[in-house]
């Protein structure tokens, strides 16, 4: 899970949490926290694609010359399978026979749950693994007795890729006022805020 979260950090240019933090969540919430992961068996898919490729070559060899439409379709399939084989072979070299492509970390409390973190390996975006992973995550929440499953926030404009993705699950959107600070001591707040900014600037330099 930590690996796919690192992929998300790199893709978005942000810093999220450490592996130790995710472990702390799981330890703290125990049976009320779980991770859902999706794996892609590259080696199996490579083997299956090679078998399809061999059959395609056989069909091409036995395709009549006057069957132009069928031959054209087979030629296109041949090119597509060659590209897939090349891609899968590269993936096996990079990731091995099996790779985790995406995952979620969820915490349950009361009759609801929060999908707190979700990550995806961009190299396998084409598989659209998050769609099934999120579905299975929410399915698990309902099996545990939850009446709702919080999918997290979206853009305020109700536009963008995140909205398009979450819209598939027919969510109910709740709009809140947002985050803000209410200083109970103006003097201490100003001092603390300046100190906080300096720490952030220092940490940013060391990354």
Stretches found by the model and what they are:
Residues 1-125:
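A conserved beta-strand-loop-helix scaffold within acyl/acetyltransferase catalytic domains
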Residues 20-24, 67-69, 134-138, 145-149, ...:
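Short C-terminal domain-edge/linker segments immediately following a structured domain
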Residues 96-171:
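Acyl-donor binding region in acyl/amide transferases
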Residues 3, 9-10, 18-19, 112, ...:
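Aromatic-enriched hydrophobic runs in primary sequence
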Residues 13-17, 60-64, 130-131, 139-141, ...:
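Glycine-rich loops and low-complexity Gly/Arg-rich segments
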Residues 24-32, 45-53, 139, 164-165, ...:
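Short amphipathic alpha-helical patches
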Residues 144-207:
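Active-site/acyl-donor-binding loops of N-acyltransferases
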Residues 18, 39, 53-55, 118, ...:
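General N-terminal targeting signals
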């Amino acid at each position: 899970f930590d690996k796919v979260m690192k992929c998300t950090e790199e893709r978005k240019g942000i810093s999220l949490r450490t592996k130790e933090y995710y472990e702390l969540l799981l330890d703290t919430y125990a049976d009320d926290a779980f991770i859902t992961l999706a794996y892609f068996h590259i080696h199996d898919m490579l083997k299956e694609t090679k078998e399809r490729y061999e059959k395609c070559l056989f069909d091409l060899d036995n395709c009549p010359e006057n069957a132009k439409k069928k031959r054209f379709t087979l030629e296109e399939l041949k090119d597509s399978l060659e590209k897939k084989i090349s891609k899968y072979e590269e993936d096996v070299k990079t990731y091995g026979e099996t790779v985790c492509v995406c995952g979620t970390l969820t915490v349950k409390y009361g009759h609801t749950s929060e999908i707190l973190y979700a990550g995806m390996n961009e190299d396998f975006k084409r598989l659209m693994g998050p769609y099934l992973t999120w579905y299975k995550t929410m399915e698990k929440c309902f099996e545990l007795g939850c009446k709702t499953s919080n999918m997290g926030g979206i853009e305020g404009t109700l536009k963008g890729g995140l909205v398009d993705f979450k819209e598939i699950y027919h969510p109910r959107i709740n709009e809140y006022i947002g985050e803000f600070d209410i200083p109970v001591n103006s003097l201490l707040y100003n001092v603390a805020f300046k100190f906080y900014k300096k720490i952030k600037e220092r940490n940013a330099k060391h990354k």
